[in-house]
Amino acid sequence: MVSISSIFWIHSAAHGIIALASSASLGTNKFLSQGRDGTVKLWDIGDGGLSRIPHLTIKTNSYHFCKLSLVKKPITWSKSKEENASRDCLRMELKGNSDTENLELRREETPSNHGSSESSEGKACPEEYVALSGEQPSEVEIWDLKSAKKFAQLPSNIPSSSSNVCDKNRGMCMALQLFLPSESQGFLNVLAGYEDGSMLWWDVRNPGTPVTPVKFHSEPVLSVCIDGFCKGGISGAADDKIVMYSLEHSTGTCMVKREINLERPGISGTSIRPDGKLAATAGWDHRVRIYNYRKGNALAILKYHHATCNAVTYSSDSKIMASASEDATVALWELYPPQNRN
């Protein structure tokens, strides 16, 4: 039995909440909330209750429908890499009036006599950032969760050499994922989907030019998810297809692996199981679909919900999947459980 210890407004009731997000990197019992009131707040759940005052409030002045994204690190990201990051900090620093053309790299050496990798001074700590659609809804902004300050802005109106990707009028940023490819030397990357069906892949070291622009969808991109190895992903849109793709950081390419056509359009949410074996989608047709992520073939269609499915996600141990719907239900599923290697 689940008991509710406290209920109160964390954002204005008139505006509502866009998203909630949690991660081990935020700290024990902490989560982020994103409201349509233009704020992102960090909360603490202590002793079974929710603190009345947020630990941190970011006033983004962003009023939109795009959900925030915390950093996804590859499952191969080891503790030794984090220790190295604490000794040899790589930071991006904004110069001037938040002009993205003046975003320059600064390398800071943490004093060796401080020694301990536990020190927060000078740590690269890529997990201390959050990405969201900006005050200008076509832009992506990255914010520092320690200082509540804007770290970078990524514009959408960039020149494109691709014949099938327009260089302007992409519209609003509709979905995004902040991630950390193994090949990026500890620098943040962002994959953003836009209203015109295009996606831009960014490396924050070069905020003026994306790694690559692609257009896999004909309607607004509603969801993107990067896999646990940060080597590929899946996207859903308001059109009638799901796209699985690879991401090659060394060559700067995003290539379609599998395109899945749907009988009914509309995918609100996508998720890839942490072990990289399964992918799930949440559809406008009230259905949750399960796919073999590596091969792209359909495995199951779940017909439990009675209204539009808005979101789907997997637990960190790959054992449980959760789906949410406009029918005001959240369902927990145990499907194709991972094999116990013991």
Language-model segments: what does each one mean?
Residues 20-28, 69-74, 121-127, 176-187, ...:
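Loop/turn segments within WD40 beta-propeller blades
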Residues 10-17, 58-65, 156-173, 214-221, ...:
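WD40/WD-repeat beta-propeller blade N-cap
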Residues 4-31:
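Blade-loop segments of beta-propeller domains
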Residues 44-50, 146-151, 246-252, 334-342:
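Short loop/turn segments immediately following beta-strands, especially the blade-tip
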Residues 313-342:
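Blade-level signature of beta-propeller repeat domains, shared across WD40, Kelch, NHL, RCC1
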Residues 1, 40-44, 140-144, 199-203, ...:
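WD40-repeat beta-propellers
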Residues 1, 34-37, 133-136, 193-196, ...:
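Conserved strand-to-loop turn within each blade of WD40 beta-propeller repeats
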Residues 5-8, 51-55, 151-152, 210-212, ...:
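A structural motif specific to WD40 beta-propellers
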